[in-house]
Amino acid sequence: MLNMSNIMSNRNSTPEASNVSSLRPPSSRAIGSNHGLRASADVAALTGAQAAASRIRPSSDFYGQPQSGQVQGNAELDPQDKLAQQWIADIDQYETTLEEMAAATLDQDFKDELSAIEQWFRVLSEAERTAALYALLQQTTQVQIRFFIQVLQQMGKNHPMSGVLSPANFDKDPMSSRLSDAMGKLEVGSARNSLARPSGGANKRHSGLDQTTINTMFPDAVAAIATEKAKFTQQTGNPPPSNRNSLVDNRNSLAAPTVSGPKDDINGQNPASPWGPSDTSRPKSSTGQTPMGQFVQPPPSAGGLRSPRPPQLSSNTNIQSTTLTAAEPQLTELPLLSPYTSSGNWASMVNTPMVPTFGQTQGNNADMVANATAMKLAALSTVNNRFALDDARRYRRARSNDGAPGQSHAQHPLSPGPQGIPSTNVVMINEHGQVLSHDHVLALQQQQQQGLQQGLGGFGGHRSRPTSPGIAMPNYGSALQFTSPQNNGFLSAYDGGAPGLINNGLVPMMGQFNLGGHHAEGYLSDHSEINRGRSPRGRRGSSKPPEDPTDPTLLQDIPSWLRSLRLHKYTDNLKDMKWTDLIELDDKQLEERGVNALGARRKMLKVFEQVKEAKKEGKI
């Protein structure tokens, strides 16, 4: 019965304890006589603390699992082995932390938040900065503390103390400048895409970032890690192995897929998150997208480092949550709340409903598409940041039966009757801005009447821009209503049939009053500006008369004078001249000055003559 109890206790002992017993030196004692000793050793391993303190490090400790059954033999190997493994784990943790930092720095939302913090930090005094840093260091974990110790030691070697402590040199800090340059050269979009790719080999980082990029962003941290590796090589004679990039074994426990995920240390404990447990409550950068620092990796397999963990561990619940956290980034591209793969949909998860469920949603989507299409079409129809729609009401031209734009100067409409134009306040202006007197208006009406009496043909020679469109001819009924600009443009296609009707016999007298006619043979109007909705003088819906080119005040300012003549494109060619010298130029001299257009030169010469005449008359 004693032998059976010994056998049962031997079977119930841990596998690691059995392996340890096999490492003992050979003994002359028989196996049967050793059952009691082995049973007592197993009991001592479960209850005593002395054997656990002097145990040989089993292979399960590499997986971060606590062990209890050890032997006092080979106790002299424990300190070196434990120190070496701790050193390797620290170096590996530093590299992982550095990659996570680089990936988080590339997040645009995090960069915005960090920029706001840096701007606040710049305005602090040196004492306030020290107090702020001290308060932040109280929130760090042991992993972060060890990492900062190595980085700060390296920074103390590379940077002068005065440059680090001086608030005035904060912007000139070499690390800040290098970090800004490196971040400026990186494409955030391509970096985010590269984070979604799993590690492809031993030389590939889990983050997908180039090692050169990380070196550029955090040179002090990289140098600190290199120093630790050099110390390890000098002490042990072998370079530290990479536990994170092994092709033989996927060590997910040593290379935590998330910075915020629990990581197993050498003693089998799950330390707190290096960046604190409050990542899920971040207001900005962790909402709506995968948090930076979490990378897509294959889910833990049966041969992974978490599977051999015995079920009696008290931290089993935390282990399961860690496994879910590691696989979570694979679901970032799926619909919200969907626990299945990217090809799954809710139709395959539930029974077919009797009543359509998503009809209203589809209607809303159709409305959204229609609204987006309308907005897109409206954006495409813009010209120079304005909508190319119908003319505004205030710019619409008057109808033909409402009178002409020239009548806007009249206080009273022209009364019909054979007596002609009554003695009302009528102001008529030619294309040069000259105000026609009442006698000129009467002569104009007489010339029109004579032309109509002689016949409606024979006056369609050189058509010019209608000088005073819309002159009311009450004596001739509706036949003379063709003087409106709309009707002129409408009948321009029938020039051969009724040329005199279009021009209303105005051409003979236009030459007398300098209103166009043969003087404007360089510019023959086809009234296209009327069809385009423009007024004959290029002004839209404005009844303001053009400025007088012989105005002495206007002549003193050549650019404004040219602008009033619609010749402002030649301002650079003529602005350095005085008006007295300008009016003396001839056609050849204007061409030498850069006025290449024949029509512009003729218009200038014509205005020059007007200015000369006004000068002779003493008006200037």
From Swiss-Prot:
Residues 1-34, 189-211, 231-317, 398-423, 527-555 are annotated as: Disordered. Residues 1-25, 232-255, 267-292 have a biased composition (Polar residues). Keywords: Cytoplasm, Nucleotide-binding, Protein transport, RNA-binding, Transport. Gene3D superfamilies: Transcription Factor, Ets-1. Coiled coil: none annotated. GO terms for biological process: nuclear-transcribed mRNA poly(A) tail shortening; protein transport. One of its GO terms (cellular component) is P-body. Residues 553-614 form the SAM domain. Its main location: cytoplasm. Monomer. Binds to RNA. Belongs to the VTS1 family. RNA-binding protein involved in post-transcriptional regulation through transcript degradation. This is RNA-binding protein VTS1. It comes from Neurospora crassa (strain ATCC 24698 / 74-OR23-1A / CBS 708.71 / DSM 1257 / FGSC 987).
